[in-house]
Amino acid sequence: MSNGRVTQVMGPVIDVRFEHNEVPEINNALIIEVPKEDGTFELTLEVALQLGDDVVRTIAMDSTDGVQRGMEVQNTGKDISVPVGEVTLGRVFNVLGDTIDLEDKLDGSVRRDPIHRQSPNFDELSTEVEILETGIKVVDLLAPYIKGGKIGLFGGAGVGKTVLIQELINNIAQEHGGISVFAGVGERTREGNDLYYEMRDSGVIKKTAMVFGQMNEPPGARMRVALSALTMAEYFRDEQGQDVLLFIDNIFRFTQAGSEVSALLGRMPSAVGYQPTLATEMGQLQERITSTNKGSVTSIQAVFVPADDYTDPAPATAFAHLDATTNLERKLTEMGIYPAVDPLASTSRALEPAIVGQEHYEVARDVQSTLQKYRELQDIIAILGMDELSEEDKLTVERARRIQFFLSQNFHVAEQFTGQKGSYVPVKTTVADFKDILDGKYDHIPEDAFRLVGSMEDVIAKAKDMGVEV
């Protein structure tokens, strides 16, 4: 293929001039051999713009340290491609599909697919709606996940998005034996490291491929790593007919990386300084995540909400694509309720009688209305105290508090912090237990027995330990 020369370096953005009529296409990968102390290093660039005069503007996938004007650049003539298939399971990759887990490198015969692809055609899409059981009570009852759907985990810093994702990976692998692909997009390297070792210890890693572009990496890598992971997931869906789970932690960092390079590419910023192409970039990623008549990719995306502001363009753009949202609330973490899922703000389009069944729907709505009533009474309680409430309202408050605590749960992945064994609760059990609480069957059991437990059996056992007759 043709060769060019570096004409300008602006941080992660590099301009390259080619011979006339040999200008590479948009999204083509280019390679520069950058000299290092111990030999040379191959830096991959991706063409983002054609500026005219045979010059292209590219985004670097790694640090541009050592790149100088005049250096030779090789055009590969194709997009960045990553390994796909069984060989990816149990391994950790970077954005370019190179293994970074210090084990044997993959051999050259492995199939590689380009990371830029069209979304499935309209006639290939599946129209069936099927619920994905997670074993997490608050999710299964109030905001159930759909197979092949897109789920957003919304929350500010430190409210438990990553722990919830780890628990979901664990539950899906242990209970459903499903394949997961994890994309670490611009998050802490330490968390990725911990996740890898935890998954290795629990054996879940054998069913998981991991792709990382972490906080310390240039924006180019953080911008493309979600596409690399999605390409691996699409192979399992399209070629093997599997139901795959794609975890993206964190989709906000995907947007953030795009905004970092947008100004350097010469684009005029739009609202709050984000890139003008925000909705397009998000759409290109999200439209590829779907169910087809061959299999499904169900995506669970952690969405960091800057300053807890849900009107910020980044989380607001992600919202438009989601089937279900799981909102994490800081107030609940302060009360010691984990997972800190807000039962009134979390939504799902699957919570309909036609999909989940009449009983499930009614119990979920009754739980929400009881909690809503409790929220409305909190001001009165704060000013006048519980004694001023009517007997009916007192009963509502007591049941609402039991429900609130019972929505918390002990997680398998948090065993080392809590010292409690994790629990997986089937949907049927969850619905039956909450129905019993609403009916007043457990009004005599103290509130504290409902904290961080699995099913009602755990509550009864805990109450007996507290010396309460059940």
Curated annotation (Swiss-Prot):
Subcellular location: Cell membrane
UniProt xrefs under NCBIfam families: atpD
Catalytic reactions on record: ATP + H2O + 4 H(+)(in) = ADP + phosphate + 5 H(+)(out)
UniProt keyword annotation of Protein biosynthesis present: no
Keyword Nucleotide-binding tagged: yes
Family assignment from sequence similarity: Belongs to the ATPase alpha/beta chains family.
Oligomer status and interactors: F-type ATPases have 2 components, CF(1) - the catalytic core - and CF(0) - the membrane proton channel. CF(1) has five subunits: alpha(3), beta(3), gamma(1), delta(1), epsilon(1). CF(0) has three main subunits: a(1), b(2) and c(9-12). The alpha and beta chains form an alternating ring which encloses part of the gamma chain. CF(1) is attached to CF(0) by a central stalk formed by the gamma and epsilon chains, while a peripheral stalk is formed by the delta and b chains.
Pfam families (UniProt xref): ATP-synt_ab, ATP-synt_ab_N, ATP-synt_VA_C
GO MF annotations in UniProt: ATP binding; ATP hydrolysis activity; proton-transporting ATP synthase activity, rotational mechanism
Function as written in the Swiss-Prot or TrEMBL entry: Produces ATP from ADP in the presence of a proton gradient across the membrane. The catalytic sites are hosted primarily by the beta subunits.
EC identifiers of the protein: 7.1.2.2
Record GO cellular component, one term: plasma membrane
PROSITE patterns, alphabetized: ATPASE_ALPHA_BETA
CDD domains to which the protein is assigned, alphabetical: ATP-synt_F1_beta_C, ATP-synt_F1_beta_N, F1-ATPase_beta_CD
Superkingdom of origin organism: Bacteria
Membrane topology: Peripheral membrane protein
Source species of the chain: Staphylococcus haemolyticus (strain JCSC1435)
Keyword entries, A-Z: ATP synthesis, ATP-binding, Cell membrane, CF(1), Hydrogen ion transport, Ion transport, Membrane, Nucleotide-binding, Translocase, Transport
Name of the featured protein: ATP synthase subunit beta
Ligand binding (ATP): 155-162
